[in-house]
């Protein structure tokens, strides 16, 4: 359903292109008739007449998705003082390491800024002490070279220490859908086989 929308606003006319880009880069303000709020965990929740009543013949999935009339989108984000919504990461892609929440997208941006990196996916993998640790799966650009220590050090100059990958694995390719979207559930699966993911 349509939950938010970006509208052309007269006050944008006086903004610089950079300021306008920030405002228009958000997911938008709640559409007419939609109530949006954040859960205590930072998940975006929405309530509106057009939100589904539930999943067809899937009562457990419905109970997880709709609580107290609010649809749990699965997106983590924020709401600013203009009531505009920003989506920061998928809830299931947030890594919880040592009690700290780490956005996989933020780490991917840091890794991707290394000139040798062509593709990257960041996932949480089991760690005996911290619950999860940050793993970066990297595809290098043709003819480029980099090692694990170099990628980690690159990230340490851009991120808080706990957000940096502790492990970097190099791959020839990453699992994607036919439309090119990363399939993180497939990338995570081998690491969590035989383990219950209790931290997320």
Regions found by a protein language model. Give the residues of each.
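Active-site loops of AMP-binding adenylate-forming
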Residues: 1-25, 29-32, 58-61
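Extracytoplasmic/periplasmic beta-strand context in beta-sandwich domains
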Residues: 3, 166-167, 185
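Conserved ATP/PPi-binding loop(s) of AMP-dependent carboxylate-activating enzymes
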Residues: 26-33, 39-68, 82, 100
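Short loop/turn motifs at secondary-structure junctions and domain boundaries
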Residues: 27-30, 129, 164-167
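AMP-binding/adenylate-forming catalytic core of the ANL superfamily
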Residues: 38, 48, 53-54, 74-163, ...
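Residues at the N-termini of beta-strands
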Residues: 43, 119, 166-167
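Hydrophobic/anchoring residues in structured secondary elements
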Residues: 122, 169-170
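Acidic/polar alpha-helix N-cap and adjacent early helical turns
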Residues: 189-200
